[in-house]
A protein has these predicted regions:
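Short metal-binding segments enriched for Cys and/or His
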Residues: 109-117
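Short Gly/Pro-enriched turn/cap motifs at secondary-structure boundaries
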Residues: 120-122
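Sec-dependent bacterial lipoprotein signal peptides
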Residues: 1-21
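N-terminal pre-ligand scaffold of iron-sulfur
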Residues: 22-96, 111-112, 125-142
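Cysteine-rich micro-motifs
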Residues: 54, 97-106
């Protein structure tokens, strides 16, 4: 009985790894991100206030930086996650909280606070980048 368990565990682990690889096919392309933003510079002063956002170049389709609180930032890639092969990007709607892709892509919506899906057909959140905050510098990286 013991000899039978080892092959079953190996086969089970193999299928588990295969299924997790299939899920990664919907991930956005990996692009190295590593930059600093000085909020004292005129180009970035809008980020001095919670609830404001800024779109900068970088990532796969651009990057959205959102100031959540005085000490917290949310940084998301603009690459829509419904079907990454379409290459669609998200934009910030007029309410400043909702992100949406073009209707010809999927008409999905995400929330800027964490990148989670508000309305499908997309099921995956937007890719979130890491940040560190040492006033007035925000460091964004993956």
């Amino acid at each position: 009985m013991r000899k039978l368990r080892i092959p079953l565990v190996i086969v089970g682990a193999y299928f588990l790894m295969q299924s997790s690889c299939e899920q990664n096919n919907q991930n956005i392309p990996y692009v190295p991100v590593n930059f600093d933003i000085n909020l004292n510079l005129p180009s970035y002063t809008s980020l001095n206030f919670p609830g404001e956002h800024l779109i900068v170049q970088g990532g796969s389709k651009g990057i959205i930086i959102y100031r959540y609180t005085m000490d917290e930032f949310v940084v998301l890639d603009r690459h829509a996650t419904f079907d990454v092969t379409l290459g669609c990007h998200v934009a910030v709607e007029s309410d400043g909280i909702t992100l949406s892709d073009e209707s010809e892509c999927s008409d999905s919506k995400w929330i800027i606070l964490d990148g989670s899906v508000m309305q499908g057909p997309a099921t995956l959140p937007l890719h979130r980048y890491r940040t560190s905050w040492n006033p007035p510098i925000i460091h964004v990286y993956n």
